């Protein structure tokens, strides 16, 4: 893991290169995704069967998982896993319940009622990865906010495996309250949810993480359906001063590096000795990490330790990165919170590691990546509702403001707009 001592501009330039390397997308992949979407849109279930056999090596006659299979899943998982899942659900629900908003009714002016109605989406699709690892936690994080929002129908898709879907995924789906589950994955699953097939219902919104093909497919169908965000590779930035614990920091960097080779892990510190210790500790921990091959490739390609002269400079650099995950391993992390402008989720102190947020604390782990934390937010209840404004004026209230409306409409050359107001009061002249 390279240690870099640079001025702010040079450091930022190198970080941008790291991020660009992590987000390189080959044109051939984009073309392949578009072709898959076109094929599924036209061929529907037949196309899904073709791609499921091609990419997953499984022949599927029926994509839907039976209620019996879902309910039996709990019999094949550990009790300790179910207990952990229930604890996570409790925390996710208690946190996201506080995000719920109510419709607005404004009756302050005589004869005028204005307001905003908040309504849940009718149905959503949740993509749950099933590639190099299984992610039951993603089920809870994507489904529970939708349930709290009042979404009527939640459809889940996840790639098939030889031998069936991981029962841990099914147990999480059952606990979270998923309505229908289908064994399809990849770009073809996103296309099926966006356009519908004979078996798969069309949804209004698609959420959930996935590989590059899934992310590009979501981008392609945006506008046909809504999506949560375009998720890039996982990333973490650790800001540390001399009080930082090298073992903890290295472990947290590797917790993101093990996701995939394109993940980014960066430490920004004010202390050279700590930087050297973190570098050694990363190598030491890689030796015993089960997913060390993936993590090592990630660290070698997209990992770095930056030395900066001050904590202020470290936070400034972090804000420019706008990371998905930001950890503050500093003396007074809460005092630094006001200086953090751009981050998906912030972890304060040595005992608030990123995996705590991934699994149990309650805030959502579906976060903006690739610098989009500058303008995107974590997944929330808000993502599963839509808002409609309403207006009610009495005759007298409209009459009192008609001249303003007519003036503005005429200035814009929209005379029918003006006429629609004037015609209501012509008989009085």
Swiss-Prot record:
Amino-acid positions noted as binding substrate in the UniProt annotation, renumbered to this chain: 234, 256, 259, 325, 358, 412, 417
MF GO annotations: histidinol dehydrogenase activity; NAD binding; zinc ion binding
InterPro entries, A to Z: Ald_DH/histidinol_DH, Histidinol_DH_CS, Histidinol_DH_monofunct, Hstdl_DH
Primary enzyme class: oxidoreductase
Catalysed transformations (reactions): L-histidinol + 2 NAD(+) + H2O = L-histidine + 2 NADH + 3 H(+)
Active site (UniProt): 324 (proton acceptor), 325 (proton acceptor)
Pathway(s): Amino-acid biosynthesis; L-histidine biosynthesis; L-histidine from 5-phospho-alpha-D-ribose 1-diphosphate: step 9/9
Family label: Belongs to the histidinol dehydrogenase family.
Function summary: Catalyzes the sequential NAD-dependent oxidations of L-histidinol to L-histidinaldehyde and then to L-histidine.
NCBIfam families linked to this entry: hisD
Protein name, entry field: Histidinol dehydrogenase
Organism classification: Bacteria, Bacillati, Bacillota, Bacilli, Bacillales
């Amino acid at each position: 893991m390279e240690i870099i001592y640079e001025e702010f501009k040079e450091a930022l330039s190198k970080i941008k290169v790291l991020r660009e390397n992590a987000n390189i997308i080959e044109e051939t992949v984009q073309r392949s995704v578009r072709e898959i979407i076109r094929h599924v849109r036209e061929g529907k279930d037949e196309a899904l069967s073709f791609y499921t056999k091609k990419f997953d090596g499984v022949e599927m006659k029926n994509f839907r998982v039976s209620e019996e299979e879902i309910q039996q899943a709990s019999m094949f998982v550990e009790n300790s896993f179910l207990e952990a899942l229930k604890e996570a659900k409790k925390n996710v629900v208690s946190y996201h319940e506080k995000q719920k908003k109510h419709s607005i009714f404004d009756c302050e002016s005589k004869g005028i009622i204005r307001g905003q109605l908040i309504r849940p989406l009718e149905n959503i699709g949740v993509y749950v990865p099933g590639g190099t690892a299984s992610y039951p936690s993603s089920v809870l994080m994507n489904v529970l906010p939708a349930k709290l929002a009042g979404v009527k129908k939640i459809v889940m898709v996840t790639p098939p495996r030889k031998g069936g879907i991981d029962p841990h995924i099914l147990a999480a789906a059952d606990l979270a309250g998923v309505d229908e589950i289908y064994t399809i994955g990849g770009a073809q699953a996103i296309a099926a949810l966006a356009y519908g097939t004979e078996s798969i219902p069309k949804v209004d919104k698609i959420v959930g993480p996935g590989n590059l093909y899934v992310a590009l497919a979501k981008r392609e169908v945006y506008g046909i359906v809504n999506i949560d965000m375009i998720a890039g590779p996982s990333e973490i930035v650790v800001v540390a001063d001399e009080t930082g614990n090298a073992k903890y920091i290295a472990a947290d960097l590797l917790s993101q590096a093990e996701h995939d080779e394109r993940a980014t892990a960066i430490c920004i510190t004010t202390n050279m000795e700590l930087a050297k210790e973190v570098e050694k500790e990363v190598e030491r921990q890689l030796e015993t990490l089960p997913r060390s091959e993936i993590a090592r490739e990630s660290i070698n390609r997209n990992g770095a330790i930056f030395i900066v002269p001050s904590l202020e400079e470290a936070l400034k650099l972090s804000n420019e990165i706008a990371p998905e995950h930001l950890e503050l391993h500093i003396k007074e992390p809460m005092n630094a919170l006001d200086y953090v402008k751009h981050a998906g989720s912030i972890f304060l102190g040595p005992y608030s590691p990123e995996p705590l947020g991934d699994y149990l604390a309650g805030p959502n782990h579906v976060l903006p990546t690739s610098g989009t934390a500058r303008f995107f937010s974590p997944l929330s209840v808000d993502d599963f509702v839509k808002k409609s404004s309403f207006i009610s004026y009495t005759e007298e209230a409209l009459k009192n403001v008609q001249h303003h409306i007519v003036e503005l409409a005429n200035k814009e050359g929209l005379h029918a707009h003006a006429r629609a107001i004037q015609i209501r009061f012509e008989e009085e002249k």
